[in-house]
Design a protein with these regions (language model features):
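Active-site phosphate/pyrophosphate- and oxyanion-stabilizing loops and adjacent acidic/basic residues
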Residues: 117
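RNase III-family endoribonuclease catalytic core
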Residues: 2-114, 122-123
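Glycine-rich, charged/polar anion/phosphate-binding loops
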Residues: 7-9, 138-141
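Short active-site-adjacent structural elements
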Residues: 109-110, 139-143
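N-terminal charge/polar-biased segments
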Residues: 1-4, 158-160
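C-terminal edge-of-domain segments
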Residues: 143-160
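Pyridoxal 5′-phosphate
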Residues: 132-136
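Short acidic capping loops at alpha-helix termini that bridge into adjacent secondary structure
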Residues: 126-129
Length: 160
């Protein structure tokens, strides 16, 4: 049996007024933010789900339930650190992450390197192990109409 395992994560959040927009641990100036129990960092949530999926540990809703007040407005970077600690506890390390943000706006290219570094720091890996891309849906669907943002992530982990 191989020591490598792969996981896929997907998350979506609605855009609303009166909330900050946090993506990859970066507060991005924008007229709307993402609605959610935590900071609603859709990109980091997809990454956490990919990591948890790779080790068959469920998803972030199982580990950090949205009906638990302890996680109200909590930083997803803090939760990502907890996921990293869990991976280490069960004997896995991150090989690489490949994440894609789906958003018509705002453009995230100016923030991409900081996002990568934030995730690398939280996971205790080199920034070269973190890939973050962004795309639009050409004004189609809920992300294209500006109703929300979505993210996919794939994680490769290795048993130690």
């Amino acid at each position: 049996m191989t020591n490598l395992r792969i996981g896929h994560g997907y998350d979506v959040h609605r855009l609303v007024r009166g909330r900050p927009l946090v993506l990859g641990g970066v507060a991005i100036p924008w007229e709307q933010g993402l609605d959610g129990h935590s900071d609603a960092d859709v990109l980091t949530h997809a990454v956490m789900d990919a990591l948890l999926g790779a080790v068959a540990a469920g998803d972030i809703g199982k580990l950090f339930p949205d009906d638990d007040a302890a996680y109200r407005n909590i930083s997803s970077m803090l939760l990502l650190r907890r996921v990293a600690a869990y991976l280490a506890q069960v004997g896995y390390q991150v090989v690489n992450i490949d994440a894609t943000l789906i958003a018509q706006a705002p453009k995230v290219a100016p923030y991409r390197e900081v996002m990568r570094q934030n995730m690398a720091d939280a996971l205790g890996v080199n920034v070269t192990q973190i890939s973050i891309k962004a795309t639009t849906e050409e004004h189609l669907g809920f992300t294209g109409s500006g109703e929300g943002l979505a993210a996919h992530a794939v994680a490769l982990v290795e048993k130690q």
